[in-house]
A protein has these predicted regions:
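Compositionally biased terminal segments of proteins
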Residues: 1-221
């Protein structure tokens, strides 16, 4: 497991060795630790703007003892067949899940780029900039990735944050759906059905998604 301090130390060390400035987006447990939702995580999930940035990041972590691992026991089969699955790098109990441009079918939306929770900068000769996503994006992406403990993390976020913006989440899911993400609608509907077993979520939010799904299925007939 990776603690918040482990993560900070790693990013500082990486920032000092970069040969170019790199900006990436932190999601999942990485972003949750910045919120204080959890004290440790199994992996550091990062989304890069382009392949050269990811390649430079990988070059650095390989000098630190990380080696490429297999995602086949981490993600379900459907996700593993996607060409946008992550490259995974491991060292003892630490793991990086490194995506480029999109997380499976989910792309970087205008809101993801502009509306962030926090920005962290790690400076050496060059700079590593890590932008932490706001909580609504974290929940959506955990619905999409469907890894072990992802739903537990969603439950933790919703229970701890009384100001969770459900409409913001729904709007982003619908935007992703309209812009080509063929999974996000069903994944979020599935998550909401499961979530309603544990806590109250207004029915209207689920209806906004199932209504869109119904229109999509009607068009196919």
């Amino acid at each position: 497991m990776i603690t918040s301090n482990d993560q900070r130390v790693l990013f500082i060390a990486i920032g000092k060795q970069l040969r170019k400035n790199i900006r990436c987006i932190a999601f999942g447990g990485t972003a949750m630790m910045y919120y204080g939702y959890k004290d440790e995580t199994k992996d550091i999930g990062l989304l890069f703007e382009n392949e050269p940035d990811r390649a430079e990041f990988i070059r650095v972590i390989e000098t630190m003892g990380f080696s490429e691992g297999s995602p086949f026991k981490i993600y379900i089969d459907e996700k593993l067949r996607d060409p946008h699955r992550p490259l995974m790098y491991m060292r003892e109990d630490a793991r990086f899940d490194l995506f480029v441009k999109q997380i499976f079918h989910t792309v970087t939306s205008p809101n993801m780029k502009e509306d962030k929770f926090a920005r962290h900068e790690f400076k050496g000769t060059h700079q590593l900039t890590v932008d932490a996503l706001r909580k609504e994006f974290i929940v959506m992406l955990k619905s999409v990735t469907e890894r072990d403990k992802d739903f537990e993390d969603i439950l933790t976020i919703i229970k701890k944050d009384t100001q969770f913006n459900w409409q913001y989440l729904i709007d982003e899911v619908l935007w992703q759906h309209e812009n080509g993400d063929t999974w996000v609608l069903m994944d979020t509907i599935k998550m909401l059905h499961e979530l309603r077993k544990y806590m109250f979520v207004e029915q209207k939010y689920l209806k906004m998604l199932t209504g869109k799904l119904g229109k999509k299925q009607a068009k196919k007939k």
